[in-house]
A protein has these predicted regions:
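N-terminal Rossmann NAD(P)H-binding glycine-rich loop of SDR-like oxidoreductase domains
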Residues: 4-24
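Conserved beta-strand positions in the Rossmann-like core of class I SAM-dependent methyltransferases
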Residues: 5, 29, 48
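Short, polar loop motifs at secondary-structure junctions
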Residues: 31-37, 161
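Conserved Rossmann-fold NAD(P)-dependent oxidoreductase catalytic core, especially the SDR/UDP-sugar
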Residues: 35, 90-133, 147, 155
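NAD(P)H-binding glycine-rich loop region in Rossmannoid oxidoreductase-like domains
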Residues: 36-91, 95-99
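Conserved beta-loop-beta element that borders a ligand/cofactor-binding pocket
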Residues: 143-165
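A conserved pocket-lining segment of Rossmann-fold NAD(P)-dependent short-chain dehydrogenase/reductase
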Residues: 173-180
Length: 180
């Protein structure tokens, strides 16, 4: 059975990834700050309380996993989303490397995608101002940290710019149109 660690499994994107992994019969260890938010009951699911800001605990939790998916987001309503993202994503990356993880897939943001030649979504003036701190922080982590990373096989997955309403109306609906 395929086994994966999923950081941020209780969030908007993380919960969709969790459901997809379980539907494909993966064994998932969901690593979340608030385990009570995971309502899924599945024999292939283990829920573990993890604070990603505690790099040593995260490293221990990731030992034995070849594959880790991080859908970590400190919360779109968090006034410190920019600072928390830039503080904690390097910790996730470092913990994964030290734990011997083979591949790290990070769910980033659409902000780094080009909407036309030379223009990234973040610079196109179409994203709501409220989203900008989170979008900017993910872009900075990607451009300033991940692009220089060579010690681990990583993927920075940028979802479509029309991913949804960031959970304001609940989880999105699986369409089966996009495949990763």
């Amino acid at each position: 059975m395929k086994k994966v660690a999923l950081i941020g499994a209780s969030g908007y994107v993380g919960s969709a990834i969790l459901n997809e992994l379980l539907s494909r019969e993966y064994q998932v260890e969901a690593m979340v700050k608030h385990p009570e938010k995971i309502k899924t009951d599945n024999p292939n699911l283990i829920v573990k309380k993890i604070d990603v800001s505690d790099k040593k605990s995260l490293e221990e939790a990731l030992k034995g996993f070849e594959y880790v998916i991080s859908a970590y987001n400190p919360g779109w309503a968090n006034t410190r989303i920019y600072e928390d993202t830039l503080a904690n994503y390097p910790k996730i990356l470092d913990a994964a490397k030290k734990a011997g993880v083979k591949r790290l897939l990070i769910v980033g943001g659409a902000g780094t995608l080009f909407v036309e030649p030379g223009v990234r979504l973040i610079d196109a003036g179409i994203l709501p101002d409220a989203w900008m701190p989170g979008v900017k922080s993910l872009g900075e982590f990607y451009l300033n940290t991940l692009l220089n990373e060579s010690e681990i096989d990583w993927v920075f997955f940028s979802p479509a710019g029309n991913l949804g309403d960031m959970g304001a109306k609940g989880p999105g609906k699986r369409t089966g149109i996009y495949r990763l």
